[in-house]
Amino acid sequence: MPSASFASTEEDDITDHLVRAMREVKTDPESPGWADFYEVHEQRPQNFADKSGKRRPKMDIEFERNARGPRPRLGFEAKRLGGRHTSNGYLGEEGLAAFLEGYYPTSHGEAGMLGYIQANSVQFWSEKLSAELTDARERHRFVDWYVRPRIQPTARILHFDSQHMTQAGASLRMIHLLLSFH
């Protein structure tokens, strides 16, 4: 997947290409054995007692364990970063806040955010998002870092984890993955 070709691509199109690539890895006979135990879903409707049919929220990407027994799910919401796509979208009600407010359910206290970087650097967005999380702790229900951002100036991918409290008072570990597409 040549990342530069996605510099102005819509969020759903990038997500589609990522999910296709992950599914190709799963079907490759040379893939590691752990790949057999997980399924990846795109735009998967979430089940709620008070929402049904088309009114159910849809998770951009969801990983599900497919072995017998409990089937934990790890959902990711994706947001573009760059130009008119700001950190407000990433952290706001259709991004991080959707997990914190219970709009998106979690099965085991973990969820993720994907940042599709289409302008500026991974370092720029990491610093911006980190500062906004710590400067507005109450708004983002930010508690602490599990894994702090470790910046490498030439990085095209960056991962960090943050700890939050949901509106219901449960601890939530957020996995942040920033991917450069320019």
Predicted regions span which residues?
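Residue-level detector of short, conserved catalytic/binding motifs and their immediate flanks
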Residues: 57-59, 74, 111-112
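Conserved beta-strand segments of the P-loop GTPase G domain that flank and frequently precede/overlap
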Residues: 77, 114-118
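Conserved N-terminal substructure of TIR/SEFIR domains
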Residues: 18, 70-72
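Active-site metal-binding core of divalent-cation-utilizing nuclease and nuclease-like domains
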Residues: 36-70
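C-terminal tail/extension regions appended to the core domain(s) of diverse proteins
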Residues: 1-12, 18-34, 85, 89, ...
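Active-site-adjacent loop/helix micro-motif of nuclease/hydrolase catalytic cores
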Residues: 72, 83-94
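Conserved catalytic cores of phosphodiester-cleaving nucleases, focusing on short active-site segments
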Residues: 61-63, 74-82
